[in-house]
Amino acid sequence: MSKVKKITVSGCHLTSAEEIIERLPVKSKKTYFFKVNKKQVETEVEKMIFVEKATVTKDLIGNIKIRIKENNASLYGYINNILYVADQDGIFEQDQQQKWISYVQRCPQMMNFDEEHFRSFVKAYVKLPSVVQNQISSIVFEPDEKDQTKCKLELDDGKVFYVRIEDMEKQLTSTNYYLVIQSYPDYKYYDYLGKKCLCIQLNSV
């Protein structure tokens, strides 16, 4: 029985082909070719950061080709001086060598997060509409005794939203965002921690 001869990866720029191949359950010259399940390989590759879609093909002589369609970074932050990067699907990884630092600096930075709350925030953030994501410049984790998941979202125009991680997806829909901004365009602080959004004028703080 023949084994996989060669695995090639194309279409990746943010991650290297070598990194993807190293993480695969399929190994060249070790895995039997007939055991390779294309869908299973695609699923495994799509669990990796910056991979939106993977397409796997096999030829008749034992080679496997993987075509990658990448997505983009969405957030980054430091935890214990280690860079963490999240993509648009909510997958995140440590980047101890900071190989992505120049790429992710255009994304909103998360500050004061531990890994648990970093994970939960990213999961909620990627579900926000793009009109909201595109306005956010930085996120600060500010828990207190009353609100253990309180976050401050700083927008590009100087406005500030206060939200809880677990409520953020429901509160910051496109409709709610436009309604609040259009109703109170000159306000700076928008507090979503209560049942209704509390808005505070620029000159009152």
Q: Where would I find each of the regions flagged by the language model?
A:
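Charged, solvent-exposed interaction patches on well-folded alpha/beta domains
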Residues: 1-5, 18-32, 39-43, 47, ...
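Juxtamembrane extracytosolic/periplasmic "stalk" immediately C-terminal to the first targeting helix
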Residues: 4-13
